């Protein structure tokens, strides 16, 4: 049962690209750039719940900050949680996280740890339980398109896949919301999506699945038992043509009218990340 104040909830999903300015700029002021983009996002979306991916924690490349905490504080959201997918830095040296449950960092346990990279959430709704789900990784990498350093055009680089995880928050209002960042390797991401959706179906309350699923053309709605609540391109941020980022609810809840949603328009460019945020206002019957 969903209870007040969650009869209406504004949910955002945002692949952060660790706060990288787009186009890239020399000597980026990482903390201030993230604060500025977050403040702009919060004014535009007025979120109750933010799902974030490609988040840094104490990384030298992004000014050694806890990006999840910075986003929560500058969005006016009291509760937050961060789950590392790896210790180290993607694309460089890293190792897998052996105990995901013990590696969660929240507003009540923000202690110095090794630098890491992963996913996070921030919300104004009290969190009563956090769960994690390992989703595995691809043994092969893929060429990915990234912006050129001079900000003009894009280039391909070969990227190895890293372990994929999901962070699931059960809220006091009865909702269960998951965030994840699935593999960019075709087929592997479908396997991960099905693994996560099966896990979520066993949890209590209405379930919302969010994140960068790396699947275009509304494929997640066709395969997972969850239905996308907004169809809008989110990638690349400098000229969106493909939807990789989703906010989804159980297909049965959407079909029965228990859940409906309205897209929140993105009225401004945030000037960070190669993904644009996606936001919906969800209504619960």
Residue spans of the language-model regions?
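N-terminal, active-site-proximal structural segment of metallo-dependent hydrolase catalytic domains
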Residues: 1-116, 190, 194, 274, ...
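Active-site flanking residues adjacent to catalytic metal/cofactor-binding acidic residues
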Residues: 14, 53, 180, 210-212
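Surface-exposed cleft-lining segments at the edges of enzyme active sites
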Residues: 22-27, 55-56, 137-157, 179-186
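Alpha-helix-centered segments that form part of catalytic cores
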Residues: 112-118, 152-165
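Metal-dependent phosphoester-hydrolase catalytic domains
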Residues: 129-134, 185-208, 213-285
